[in-house]
C-alpha cells in the first residue's frame, strides 16, 4: 500500500472497476426489496455547477447506503434536454440546438462519472430523442380521445416586428428582447390539458404524502386553492344577455356597487366600438403582463363602459367598468365588486369616485370609516334587507338558496388551479401530435405515424421556428386527404412530468411503459431536488402519474414517496459600483480579504489592481453574481471524494451550504489522515480475530467509540439525514485511533474493526477512497457490495460513568462510579468526596436527590 494518498490514482482505479463490471446495472428482482432513488435530472446547459454537485451527491449517498442495506437499488440519470436556452445558444454560437445539446450531454456525463455517482447508465435517456417523445405524443393523443385535451384561445406575448410569440423571459421592460418592439398581448389558439378534472384528487392526495416537506404541500394547496362560493348571473340593463360571476363572499352581495370586467371581455370590445377613448385604453391593456404577481403590484386602472347590470336582489342598476386587473382566463372574466369589503375594489372605487357601501359589521372591532378602509373580516350583516342580522356564514347559505330558487345561481366549488396550457410557439421542443383537416376539424396523429419528428439539422434565424418557417414540414395526409401538422411544440414540463416512470423501462420500443417493470420500481422511494420546483414540476408530475394510472400503466396514486428539497449553495459576493449604481461583480478567487489585528473588520481588494472592492452579502452561487466555483477545478485539485465529503459535511441537506475553500482543504486533510491510519495499521500485520471477552478497558473504550459511530450514522441515514453530525463522529473516532497505542493482537483487532467501520460508514460519501482502503484492510469483496456494519449494543455499555455532584444546586465535584451502582452506593461516593465534604461542614442535610447516570444533588441548610 502506498504511504501517501493520491486521489486521482485512487479515483481512476475505482471508476475503472465500476465501468468494467457495470457495477450499478440493476434489473427487477421480485422478492427482493427495491429502492428507487432519483435526483431531478439536469438541463444540459454545458457544465455542472455546485448546485448540481450537491443535489447529485445527496442522491448518490442515499443510494449507496440503501445498497449496503441489501436492497435492489435503482439510481438512473438522464437529460431534460428541450428548452429555450438551446435556441438562444444556437443563435449565439451559430450551431443547431441539437448539436449544442448533445455536445453538452457528453461533457456533463463525463463530469458526473468523475464525481463517482453510481448511476445505471444503461437507462440513460434524453427527452429530445424521438424514442422518448414518441410516447409522450402518443399519450397526448390518448388524452385527446378521452376528452382531457382541448383547444381554446389564449393570450400570449406578441412581437409585432418579428411577428413571433415571445416567452415571458424574452420580454424585457415590455419590449421584445431581439427587435426592441413594444410587445402586445394577442389571442391565439392553444392546446390545454384538463388538470382541473383532477384538482380534488391532487388536493386530497397531498395528505398521503407523509414524507414530503410541509412547506411544499402548503404551496401546492395554495396553488390549487379550493374555494366554496356561489356562481350567479346579473341581467344587463337595456341590453340582451347577462353577466356571470363567481364569489366566495355571497354574504356581501348587497354591497355590490359596480361590476368589473376584463379588457378582452366581449362587452368591453362592444363598448369600445363606439368609444375611442375606451378603445385606446383596451389597446394599452394588451401590453400588460398577466402574471398574478405583476397584477398584485401594478397600478389599478379602469374605464366606464356605459353599460349597467341589474342587481338580482335589489333591482338597482350598477355600472360595468373595464379593469386592468381582471383576467379573461379566470372564471368568466367578470367580478362583482364590493368596495366596502374588498381592498382591491376599495382602492379602485376611491380612485374613480364609485360608491362604497357597508354591509358587514364586525363585533368587538374598532370603528372603521368604510370610506377610508375596507372591512374584509366576516361578521354580522347590516344594510342588507332580509339578510340583516345574520352572521356571514348564515348569509352565505341564505343568499345561495335565494339565488338558486330564483334560477339564476347555485353553490359551486371553484379552484384557482387553471388547465395546463401546453402549447409553445418554439422550435426546440416535442411537436404536438395533432393535425388540421381541410374542413378545419382537428385529428390526432395515429400511432403508426408517431413520432412526429422534430428536424434536428436546422438553421436558426432568431425570429421564426424552423418548422413554422418551412411550409413543407407541416404538409401531411390523413385518410388520403391533405392535412396540416400542428407546428407548436410541447411545454417542456411535459417531458419532465413522466421521465421518472420511463426510467423503469427506458429501452422499451413497443409501449410507453411496461406495467410490470413500472409497478416493481414505482413509486420513487426518495426524490431529491430544489424547492423552486415545489409547484409546477411536482404538481404536473403528480397529475401525470394519475393519468398514467387511469390508463392502466401504473397502479400507484403518487409518483414520489419521500421528497428531500436540498438547500442552496451560497458564497460571498464582491463588487464595485459605478456612478450610475451599476454593479460589477468579481469572483471570490480574484479577491484578497484582509482582517485587522483583532481578526475582525474584513476589507477586500481585487488582486489584479490592489484596489478595494465592496463585500456584499452571501448569496446563491450564480453567473450574475460571479460567485460560482467550477466543480471541475475542485476535482482536479482535491479529488472527487473531497468535494463529496465537503458537500455532506458543511450543512444538513435541507439547509443552505456556505462555500468555503478552507472547509474543502479541511476535508482533504481528513481523508489523508484516514489513509495514513490505514497504512500504518496494515504495515503492522498481526491482528488476531477479535475476542470481545479478552478486551481490556482501553480496548473496550475504543470499541465503544466504534459502535457509537455506527449507531450515530445509522440513525442519521434512517431518520434525520443530518449526515454532517455523523461525519463529525467519524472524525472523533479517528482522533481516538490516533491516540490509541496498543499493538497487542487484540489491540490491533480493535483498531482493525474501527478502521473497517470508518471505511464502511464513509463508503456512501467517499466511495473511491473506501473502495481502495477496503481492499487494503484485507477484503476480497468490494466495499460497494459490503453490508452496512452491525451495531453491537453490548459494546455501548460502559463499565463506569461520570456523575456530577451538586451541593444546593451548585457543581462541587465530578465522580467516577460503576455503571451498575445503585442509589445508596452513588450517595456514599458523593458524601466521601473531599470537596463535597468542605461545602457540607457545620450544615444539616435536608435531602439527597439522585438522578441515575447523571447527578447527585445534596440539599443542606
Swiss-Prot record:
A motif ('KMSKS' region) lies at residues 620-624. It holds the Pfam family tRNA-synt_1g. It comes from the Bacteria. A motif ('HIGH' region) lies at residues 42-52. Belongs to the class-I aminoacyl-tRNA synthetase family. InterPro entries: aa-tRNA-synth_I_CS, aa-tRNA-synth_Ia, Leu-tRNA-ligase, Leu_tRNA-synth_edit, M/V/L/I-tRNA-synth_anticd-bd, Methionyl/Leucyl_tRNA_Synth, Rossmann-like_a/b/a_fold, tRNAsynth_Ia_anticodon-bd. This is Leucine--tRNA ligase. GO terms for cellular component: cytosol. It is found in: Cytoplasm. It catalyses: tRNA(Leu) + L-leucine + ATP = L-leucyl-tRNA(Leu) + AMP + diphosphate. The gene is leuS. It comes from Hahella chejuensis (strain KCTC 2396). Keywords: Aminoacyl-tRNA synthetase, ATP-binding, Cytoplasm, Ligase, Nucleotide-binding, Protein biosynthesis. Gene3D superfamilies: 2.20.28.290, 3.10.20.590, HUPs (3.40.50.620), Isoleucyl-tRNA Synthetase, Domain 1 (1.10.730.10). CDD domains: Anticodon_Ia_Leu_BEm, LeuRS_core. The keyword Ligase applies. ATP binds at residue 623. Its EC number is 6.1.1.4. GO terms for molecular function: aminoacyl-tRNA deacylase activity; ATP binding; leucine-tRNA ligase activity. GO terms for biological process: leucyl-tRNA aminoacylation. It is an enzyme of class 6 (ligase).
